[in-house]
């Protein structure tokens, strides 16, 4: 792990203004859909706990114009998804966002939608794309040119190691690629570049045999083969998991390609809970600890696709310590939307990062 720390962290800042068109949404959500359509940051769906122990899913579609200079965002609710949804995936392509799968209180989803804006009315236009071969939620999604990938997650209600792909605009059915090696991965992150797919994070809940991986996987689309990628490490040298984190491919104006990652759970604390061990805290008290106890990842991490090495360009920052956030990219600037600060507590914050 290289640590090329910049002297000051003005590159990371919190913006004010969060959507509030539905009762409870203003408390912040996690696992929403978000991305840019032109100059508009679009946020849709997500979930939270407006009342303790009662998860609520949302259907609103919100838009805020972003110039890059503002410190606050002004939101307008411009429409609704066909039903409340969260824990799906989203990619940006041209003047549209593609929303993939997800779930709500009633069921998990097979649906794949594209959304773009009516330039005159400012309202969202939804189009239905080929549905998934099974319901999928809590997966990773990414785009390689025009091929959409869905990695792991819960498929038909079961943790999966499946890899699915669809050529947008050309194919009517999804392709089943070679499975991820070893265990299923729920809540992984992924990105794709020049014929290769990169995956980190995810978890497999299986009692004392539960797994929360730190190392990643690379899938070569030509040879259909898998290789192992190094784990990210924090400034103290400890391996990190990117379970519940975000990942985004960023290509600089000079052509340098990096996968930028932030957030995610603490491996040891999360494993202790999903395995049912509860050696760190009594099960009844797991949701009652202070935010700092959960030790969500507060490092901004970049994986250089040329060197194959991880880097930490900024000091640790508590603004990034969240799980289940969504990330949107405009130019080389990233906007992190919502997420949870600890299990059950969402953030209404939007964090702007300029690498």
What are these regions, as identified by a protein language model?
Residues 1-355:
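Kelch-like beta-propeller repeat domains
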């Amino acid at each position: 792990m290289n640590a090329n720390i910049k002297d000051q962290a003005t590159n990371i800042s919190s913006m004010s203004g969060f959507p509030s068109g539905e009762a409870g949404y203003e408390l912040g959500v996690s696992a929403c859909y978000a991305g840019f359509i032109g100059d508009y940051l679009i946020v849709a769906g997500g979930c939270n706990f407006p009342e303790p122990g009662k998860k609520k899913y949302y259907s609103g579609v919100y838009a805020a114009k972003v110039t890059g200079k503002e410190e606050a965002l002004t939101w307008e609710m411009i429409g609704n998804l066909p039903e409340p949804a969260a824990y799906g995936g989203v990619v940006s392509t041209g003047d549209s966002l593609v929303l993939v799968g997800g779930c709500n209180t009633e069921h998990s989803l097979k649906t794949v939608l594209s959304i773009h804006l009516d330039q005159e009315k400012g309202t969202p236009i939804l189009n239905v794309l080929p549905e998934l071969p099974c319901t999928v939620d809590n997966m990773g999604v990414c785009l390689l040119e025009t091929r959409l990938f869905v990695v792991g997650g819960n498929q038909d209600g079961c943790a999966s190691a499946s890899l699915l792909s669809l050529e947008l605009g050309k194919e009517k059915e999804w392709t089943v690629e070679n499975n991820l090696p070893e265990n299923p991965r729920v809540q992984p992150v992924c990105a794709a570049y020049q014929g290769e797919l990169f995956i980190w994070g995810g978890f497999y809940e299986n009692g004392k045999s539960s797994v929360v991986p730190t190392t990643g996987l690379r899938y070569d689309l030509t040879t259909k083969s898998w290789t192992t990628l190094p784990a990210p490490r924090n400034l103290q040298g400890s391996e990190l998991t990117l379970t519940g984190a975000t990942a985004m491919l960023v290509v600089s104006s000079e052509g340098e390609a990096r996968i930028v990652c932030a957030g995610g759970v603490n491996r040891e604390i999360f494993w202790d809970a999903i395995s049912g061990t509860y050696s760190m805290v009594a099960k009844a008290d797991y949701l009652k600890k202070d935010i700092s106890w959960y030790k969500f990842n507060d490092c901004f991490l970049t994986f250089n696709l040329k060197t194959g090495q991880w880097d930490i360009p900024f000091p640790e920052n508590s603004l990034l310590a969240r799980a289940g956030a969504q990330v949107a990219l405009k130019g080389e600037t990233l906007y992190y939307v919502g997420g949870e600060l600890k299990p059950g507590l969402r953030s209404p914050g939007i964090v702007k990062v300029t690498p």
